């Protein structure tokens, strides 16, 4: 399997990726998009240069769109993952007093 832990390791595979490998690659892509967003936001917060802020704001928005597209692709290919993420969101709302217990009990 090709490695997706570094951009330098990504290469054309000799064979098609397995479904598990595709999911792993998509999850790596999602993480990479969020990492890029964080880097660009840190640069914007560290400069007064309006040209830099303008361009990086646009790039950051693009990265958010990419992350959203990859998340939707993950949802399509692995609905079980989506169910777990949604459960985590409902659990957080419950812990914050903003929603019912996702486990259906009173504790």
Language-model region placement:
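Iron-associated oxidoreductase/ferritin-like identity signal
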Residues: 1-107
């Amino acid at each position: 399997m090709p490695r997706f832990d570094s951009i330098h390791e990504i290469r054309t595979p000799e064979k098609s990726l397995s479904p598990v490998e595709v999911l792993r690659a998509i999850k790596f892509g999602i993480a990479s998009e969020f990492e890029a967003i964080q880097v660009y936001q840190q640069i914007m917060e560290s400069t007064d240069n309006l040209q830099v802020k303008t361009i990086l704001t646009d790039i950051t928005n693009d990265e958010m769109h990419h992350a959203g597209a990859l998340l939707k692709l993950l949802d399509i290919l692995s609905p079980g993952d989506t169910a777990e993420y949604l459960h985590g969101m409902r659990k957080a709302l419950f812990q914050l007093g903003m929603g019912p217990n996702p486990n259906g009990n009173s504790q």
